[in-house]
Structure formats: structure tokens, C-alpha cells
Amino acid sequence: VTNRDAKYEATVVAKSATVTYDGKEHSAIGVETYEFVVDGNTYTVTGLSTEDPTQKDAGTYTNNITGTPVVLDAEGHDVTAQFTVKTENGKLIINKAQVTLKSADLSKKYDGKALVNGKTALETETGFAKGEGATYTFTGSQTIVGSSANAFSYTLKANTKESNYTISKNEGTLTVTDRGTKYTVTIKANSATATYDGIEHSAIGVETYKFVLD
């Protein structure tokens, strides 16, 4: 039996995996197969190993194949000389998780007091891994008739890495509308009473321009 003029080809492919960040470890382990059937005969490639990356954080990690391939036939004979063995590294891809944050839309009739978010929770807060998240500070305020953003900022918790997330931040609207029944305000000019004494006397200004409502 002589060597083949044209060698058989075998490609060993390392396993790959693609997941979305969830705070847990993920792996890409081993290869798709070490066994190949050529012309009805089964062959096994030995001598190779994979790095088998295990990671938690978002990123791309290579599952490298290392070693020197040895090809054995079904009876265990070394037939490496009859083969060209190629390798393809795999990848562990952990994609960033998508987080959506949105403050609420709030409204009220004008009452002279600022409309703020207060203790109202975010309307939408989705995508954080279990045990991870953020704290929020609301700065939006609307007092007069009109509307403005229910503005807020966030600070990620100590155990939460920004690099593991793509965060979409949307602000709701604070709206103050006209009152159905208007307030009634009476402004009184100051009065004065005096007895004639040959001197000028005056009644100047108003009692007050300031009013407390509700």
C-alpha cells in the first residue's frame, strides 16, 4: 500500500457559542467532531485540544485549537500521512444586554406647586441581569401651564458593569394643564382716614400683591 498522491482533507472545527449577557458564566467547549468518514471508512483525529473559554462579561473570546493532529483509522493505525488536517478556531460571543429605562408621563391641573416625579417608579426598567441595576435621581419639574421632560439620571450599582449593557434612556413628560375653575384673587388698594390738620395725607399702594392658595 503506497501513500496517496492527493491527501484526504479533514477540518476540525472548535465549538462556538453566542449568548446575551445575563450575569452567568458561559462556555464554548470542545470541537464539533473528531471523527470523519472518508470513502466509507471512519477516521479519528487525536492530539488536539481546545482552550474552552468560560466567561461572564460581554465580549468575544476565542476557542483556540492547539496541538499536533494524529489521524487514526478504525483499527488504530496511524494514517496521518494520508491526510491534510486543518483546524478552525471557535468563538464564545457574549453580547451586551439591552436595557430600557423610561420615566413616567405625569400630569395635573395647575395648582401653583411644582409637578415632580416624586416617588413614582420608572415606567419602564427592563434588561438588567438578576441582582444588578441602577439607582435613579429625578430632576424634572413643571410648575406653570405647559410641559417639560421628566428628567432623570442613573447611577449603576457597584456590581453592575456598563460594558455589559447597551442602555436606552428615555424621559417621559411632565404636563401642567389649565384649571377648570380659575382662582379668584382680589387686590385691595390701601385706604386711610385722617382729620384735617392742614397737612397732606395719602393712601398709597395696595394691601398685598402676594396670595397663598390651597
Give the positions of each predicted feature.
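Solvent-exposed beta-strand/loop surfaces, strongest in extracytoplasmic domains of secreted
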Residues: 1-214
